[in-house]
């Protein structure tokens, strides 16, 4: 049976190769924590693909929130990624509220609602991608304050927007458009033009 560290590493290798290869450059003792963080991110980011409608997805995100907040101990202990991320949070004194905001932001993924403004998109990418970079920096600092919060914020938005643009055909095929309505309007385009 595969241990939680190997399980998380396999998820990241299979589902997030960019972060997998980047993690190989990290010090060996930090890699299990990073793989747990990125496996958790993969788990919540792919929920839409594993459900047929939004409500079951919201239930899964609620389960993750409860696990992160210290509830569902037995269930979390039996789930390799949940067990690993709870351990990493504890070992590195990671802020649980950042993880909770990540799960709350991922509710947007479950619906095809338009994103009204650039500010709304920045909020979503900040709570998902920027938070992930910031948490990784804390892990790399051994649980200490690494500095660079503002840089992590900007880097996360840039990384996420690049990913969203790269995935535009995939998202459009399922009825989602992450380009804010105000940006489309400035260009004389409408959301339906991309679907």
Protein language model features and the residues they cover:
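Acidic catalytic motifs of isoprenoid enzymes
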Residues: 1-157, 161-195
């Amino acid at each position: 049976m595969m241990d939680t560290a190997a399980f998380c590493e396999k998820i990241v290798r299979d589902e997030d190769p960019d972060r997998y290869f980047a993690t190989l450059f990290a010090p060996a003792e930090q890699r299990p924590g990073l793989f747990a963080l990125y496996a958790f991110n993969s788990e919540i980011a792919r929920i839409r693909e594993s459900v047929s409608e939004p409500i079951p997805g919201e239930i899964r995100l609620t389960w993750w929130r409860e696990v992160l907040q210290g509830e569902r101990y037995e269930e979390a202990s039996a789930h390799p990624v949940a067990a690993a991320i709870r351990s990493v949070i504890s070992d590195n004194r990671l802020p649980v509220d950042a993880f909770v905001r990540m799960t709350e932001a991922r509710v947007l993924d479950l619906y095809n609602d338009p994103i009204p403004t650039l500010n709304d998109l920045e909020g979503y990418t900040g709570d998902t991608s920027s938070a992930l970079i910031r948490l990784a920096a804390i892990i790399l600092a051994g649980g200490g304050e690494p500095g660079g919060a503002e840089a992590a914020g900007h880097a996360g938005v840039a990384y996420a927007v690049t990913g969203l643009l790269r995935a535009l055909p995939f998202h459009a095929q399922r009825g989602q458009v992450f380009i804010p309505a105000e940006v489309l309007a400035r260009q004389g385009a409408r959301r339906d033009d991309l679907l």
